[in-house]
C-alpha cells in the first residue's frame, strides 16, 4: 500500500499549474528555497553529487540543486506536479530527471545510490512519516547526507503555521496543513534513530514579516530543518 494520502495528493495536484508562480500559492516555498538550499549546500557541497529530492512537487528545490552542479532526480506521486516540473526544466535548460514513484519503492530498487537525499516539507503530509525516513536512510550512500524539513507540533506552530499563515495572512491556501500530522523534533529524532542515520544539526526557520523573508535560527518551535548523515 502506498504511503500517501489521496486527499493530500489531489490538493497539490490541483495547484500544480501555479507551482512556478512566485506570487501565487507556492510563494512561501519560493521565498524559503534560498535558505534551505544554502543550508543543504553548506553541509553536502552539492557540486558533482548525485541527489534525490523526495516529494519534489514542481521541482523548485530540484532545479536549484541542479543549478549548483548536482545530478538530480526528483520523485513525487503527483503526475500533475511532475508534468509542470518537466516542462519548467525544459524551459530553464536545467537538467533534472523526474519520476512518479514512491520513496519506499525507489529505496527497494536503488539502495545506497545517492550522495544526498532531501525530503523537504513532505513528512507532515504522509500517513507514515517514519517509513519515509527509513526509505531515505536506505537510499543514501554510506557517508552521505539526508535532509528533512517539517513543522513542529505545539500551540505556537498551530497559531502561526495554520491560523496565521492560512487564515489571517493568507500566505497559504486554507487546509494546506493538518495540524495532527505535524511532527515534534523528538519524534523525528526517534524515526532517525531507528535507522543507521545520525543527526548532525537541527535548525529552525524564522519568518520575518516586515522584510517578508525567511532566515535560519535556533528557534525550532514552528518550521525546522534536520541534517543527518549515514555512517560510513
Swiss-Prot record:
- Detail which positions bind S-adenosyl-L-methionine: 36, 55, 76, 120
As for what it does, the entry says: O-methyltransferase that catalyzes the 2 O-methylation steps in the ubiquinone biosynthetic pathway.
User: Which segments does the entry list as coiled coil?
Assistant: none
Q: Which organism is it from?
A: Burkholderia cenocepacia (strain HI2424)
| Molecular functions (GO terms) | 2-polyprenyl-6-hydroxyphenol methylase activity; 3-demethylubiquinol 3-O-methyltransferase activity; polyprenyldihydroxybenzoate methyltransferase activity
Which keywords, in A-to-Z order, does the entry hold? Answer: Methyltransferase, S-adenosyl-L-methionine, Transferase, Ubiquinone biosynthesis
Pathway listed:
Cofactor biosynthesis; ubiquinone biosynthesis
The answer to whether the entry has keyword Transport is: no
- Gene3D superfamilies given for it? Vaccinia Virus protein VP39 (3.40.50.150)
In Swiss-Prot or TrEMBL terms, this protein is called: Ubiquinone biosynthesis O-methyltransferase
Amino acid at each position: 500500500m502506498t504511503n500517501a494520502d489521496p486527499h493530500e495528493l489531489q490538493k497539490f495536484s490541483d495547484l500544480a499549474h501555479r507551482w512556478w508562480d512566485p506570487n501565487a500559492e507556492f510563494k512561501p516555498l519560493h521565498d524559503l528555497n534560498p535558505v534551505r538550499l544554502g543550508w543543504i549546500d553548506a553541509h553536502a557541497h552539492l557540486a558533482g553529487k548525485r541527489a534525490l529530492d523526495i516529494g519534489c512537487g514542481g521541482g523548485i528545490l530540484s532545479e536549484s540543486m541542479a543549478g549548483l552542479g548536482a545530478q538530480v532526480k526528483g520523485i513525487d506521486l503527483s503526475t500533475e506536479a511532475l508534468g509542470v516540473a518537466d516542462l519548467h526544466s525544459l524551459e530553464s535548460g536545467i537538467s533534472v530527471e523526474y519520476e512518479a514513484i514512491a520513496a519506499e519503492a525507489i529505496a527497494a530498487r536503488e539502495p545506497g545510490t545517492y550522495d544526498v537525499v532531501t525530503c523537504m516539507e513532505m513528512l507532515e503530509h504522509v500517513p507514515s512519516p517514519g517509513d519515509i525516513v527509513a526509505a531515505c536512510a536506505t537510499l543514501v550512500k554510506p557517508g552521505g547526507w539526508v535532509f528533512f524539513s517539517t513543522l513542529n507540533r505545539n500551540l505556537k506552530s498551530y497559531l502561526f503555521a495554520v491560523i496565521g499563515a492560512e487564515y489571517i495572512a493568507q500566505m497559504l491556501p486554507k487546509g494546506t496543513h493538518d495540524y495532527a500530522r505535524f511532527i515534534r523534533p523528538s519524534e523525528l529524532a526517534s524515526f532517525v534513530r531507528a535507522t543507521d542515520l545520525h543527526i548532525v544539526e537541527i535548525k529552525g526557520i524564522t519568518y520575518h514579516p516586515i522584510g517578508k523573508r525567511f532566515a535560519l535560527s535556533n528557534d525550532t518551535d514552528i518550521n525546522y530543518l534536520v541534517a543527518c548523515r549515514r555512517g560510513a
